[in-house]
Structures are given as structure tokens and as C-alpha cells.
């Protein structure tokens, strides 16, 4: 069975079919309707063969159907007949859940997708649980306001990364995952990964779409198969957690008073 996986994002829609080695994409944005999305996806797929379709949808999905309109796209998605539009059986799943499914290994995994917005999914012993944390209150806004694209553009990379570390720390304490994956297009903009995290691979969204129909990594082309992490020791990463930043500020204040940093000797101490 050949599967067409469609990853719908706030900036682009990406597609890949089993047996193909190069994803294709087109621009999405606030004017993208589901009718236009299907038309563009079918046109872009061209001569690709597919028997079924998987759609990663940027919103709440219940029993395979969107139940809320996406925040970054046009309306009309709720109640839209995707199977009629594509002409083949279709499965719809939350976009973060689709990438999480492709990233999953075992146990309790938390997936956070850092893209235009914030995707969030827990998988516990194979059970996929989309979380929809993006628009929950966080500081003076929502999680998405601080760690989504708006937060990155407004705060700058360093402060944005600090909030990513803070969000991971909070969610890790609350959910107790034994595996944390940071995916999405902006994950690669992190200078370092928070402790206990591994980097996701955007190609895992396609793998998740294939897995929805029982297909696995054997259908992901070699140039897209995620590379296992190196076993070589890594250099110690700079700690950008909120606790570390607080300690640095206290150290700087102490340095101003004494004229030296902790552990630093002056000529009077020698």
C-alpha cells in the first residue's frame, strides 16, 4: 500500500509518498483553505502513486476529524470531507502527533514541535496523546507566544532559547517523560539542547504518516532516515536555564562589589 503523507504547517505544506526520495512543499499561510490545500497537494504530487493519505493537521483532532479551526490558516477545515476531495481513504491526526509518532521509540516520550507555533504530544507505551499546550497561559501570554516563531522574532534567539529551556524544565517535572524530543523547523536554531532532550528530524512527520497505515521506516528513503546520535562524548553545553541565569546575575553583582568573580584570584590574594 502506498501512502501520501501531508504535513500541514503554518508556513508550508510538505508532502512525501512511499517510494519517493525527495519531499515537496508549497506555501501555506493565513489564506490557505482545505480545498486549496488538497488541490495544491494533488497537483504537486503529480505522478506519485498513493492508495491512502495521512494528514498532519495544525489543530485539535478528535476521532480523525478536526474539531477546531487552525490559528494560522484560513477557516473551513472543520467538517471538510478530505476523503471526497482526495478520492482515497484519509486519516487525519494532529501535526505534532504525526511527527511524534515517527520519532517514538519506547516508554514515555514528550514531543515538542518548535515551528510557527508550538506542537505538543505525549506517547505513553505506544498510546498517542496530543496535548495542545500552545495556547495555555504562560508568563504574560501563552506558551506559543514565547517559544513559537513570534517569540523567537520578538525576543531574539538567546532569550527565546532560555524560554525553551524553561518550558522543557516545567513540562518534564509535570509529565515525567523518559524521552524528550524537540522537533519542528526552529529546533535547529537552538545553540544547545536542554538536558535530557534529543533533536527530532522533520522527516519523522512523514514516517509518522506512513506508520498511521502500518508502514514503517523501510519506506523512508535513505537520505531522510534519521541518523542515530553519536556515541562520542559531547563538549559541555552552556547552561541557559532560568536558574543558571539567576546565578550569573548574582555572581555579576558580587563581582562589582568585590572586584573579582568567584574563584578568581587578584594580586592581593596571591
Label each PLM-derived region with a short phrase.
Residues 2-39, 43, 124-154:
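Short glycine-rich, Thr/Ser-proximal phosphate-binding strand/loop in the N-terminal lobe
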Residues 29-42, 46-54, 59-108, 145-147, ...:
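Glycine-rich phosphate-binding loop and adjoining helix at the ATP-binding site
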Residues 153, 159-162, 170, 186, ...:
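Oxyanion-binding and handling regions
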